Amino acid sequence: MSAGWFRRRFLPGGPLPEPRPAGPRSSPVPYHRPRFLRGSGSSPGATDASRRPDARPVRSPARGRTLPWNAGYAEVINAEKSEFNEDQAACGKLCIRRCEFGIEEDQEWLTVCPEEFLTGHYWALFDGHGGPAAAILAANTLHSCLRRQLEAVVEGMIAPQPPMHLSGRCVCPSDPQFVEEKGIQAEDLVIGALENAFQECDDVIGRELEASGQVGGCTALVAVFLQGKLYVANAGDSRAILVRRHEIRQLSSEFTPETERQRIQQLAFTYPELLAGEFTRLEFPRRLKGDDLGQKVLFRDHHMRGWSYKRVEKSDLKYPLIHGQGRQARLLGTLAVSRGLGDHQLRVLDTDIQLKPFLLSIPQVTVLDVHQLAVQEEDVVVMATDGLWDVLSNEQVALLVRSFLTGNQKDDPHRFSELAKMLIHNTQGKDNGATGEGQVSYDDVSVFVIPLHSQAQEGSGH
């Protein structure tokens, strides 16, 4: 990102439109739940009684409707935090077409995959905020963006080594050596495709929400299986973990104002105009008061992992760029995440200060080589929005997973959806012997449970 581009994009006089006056606004997409929940019984709405923390109905796919790999899914709406369930989910088969160099093909989404195509699978969770629109758009769009990005690099993915020139030309005899020295492999092309797909999807959401005068954003957690590897891409505070008999491995990191403090402070240091004189970029252990003026107090800036002391000046009394701790930390007093999709129109309350310049849509991607795992029958990946992780730790989830799968009917294709439902029940305040006193999550909760064993020995299709 160049400084010139950034200034044109975000600083005064840039292309972001001013907030529109209040009035009736039509959503760019109708509200709906994931398509694979059709026929599951419960309607999207819920009565007041069913929105109580301990009485909210948990939804999962109807029996007879299976997801890729017999993966399990379950969800529950929030306890009257918002009118709608702002989470969304998507899953399906990815069909990546190989094409001859120079042939331009249409962009229609394919549902039938001839054997000569590279195929994979896709699971995604989107946790919306400021309304459900951004999450719905992401669920409808991101897989198509990813397919296009993968098709742009598929010839490099299937080559023994990605060529310097996709056309196959060798302009410089040392080109293969340069690629080898950089350590570029097929998985790097998949990672790049995921990063570009997130950015493309973010642009689409921005255009759609701007056209309808809407605001809103969402986090995105995606798992993609291609060529024997599982790619987990995360932008936000959802989480994925691998649960095995004797191992728990976290496959994603949460991106919050706290975890990305230095990046956010660096941006405010480079472009102080973004704070409009209303915020201080410095971090202090607590919000400073007038009595702190002239005193030396603990602080840290963008270049610091540790702490030091400074004498408090009047400008230090402004509201902090990042305020609060843990789940309560907020960026510009507004947003609890630092990465995600959307939020192009989001401003600090009663100001023209934009949050989008501080947000990244680019995910962190973790690669799990499934074929190198010696996968056992009860090995699963659990993906969930933050409503689950607010009340259950990785260890508690792993304990529940192992307890459920031991002795449960192994030939039941819906047992992983039952497992996902059980995990959600453990966020509804019900005491469970495995986890102790039941805690309550008032948030929307969505969970995928992806079994690895059935695919561990299966090669990717071409």
Swiss-Prot record:
Region of interest (Disordered), ranges: 1-66
Cofactor binding, per record: Binds 2 magnesium or manganese ions per subunit.
Name used for this protein in its record: Protein phosphatase 1M
Gene Ontology terms, MF aspect: manganese ion binding; phosphoprotein phosphatase activity; protein serine/threonine phosphatase activity
Keyword 4Fe-4S: no
Entry GO terms, CC: nucleus
Catalytic activity, reaction form: O-phospho-L-seryl-[protein] + H2O = L-seryl-[protein] + phosphate; O-phospho-L-threonyl-[protein] + H2O = L-threonyl-[protein] + phosphate
Cofactor(s) this protein requires: Mg(2+); Mn(2+)
UniProt family annotation: Belongs to the PP2C family.
Residue ranges of every copy of the PPM-type phosphatase domain listed in the record: 100-452
Keyword Nucleotide-binding recorded: no
Positions of Mn(2+) 1 binding: D127, G128
Example of a GO biological process term: protein dephosphorylation
Comp. bias intervals (Basic residues): 1-10
CDD domains assigned to the protein according to its UniProt record, in alphabetical order: PP2Cc (cd00143)
Source domain of life: Eukaryota
Record's subcellular location: Nucleus
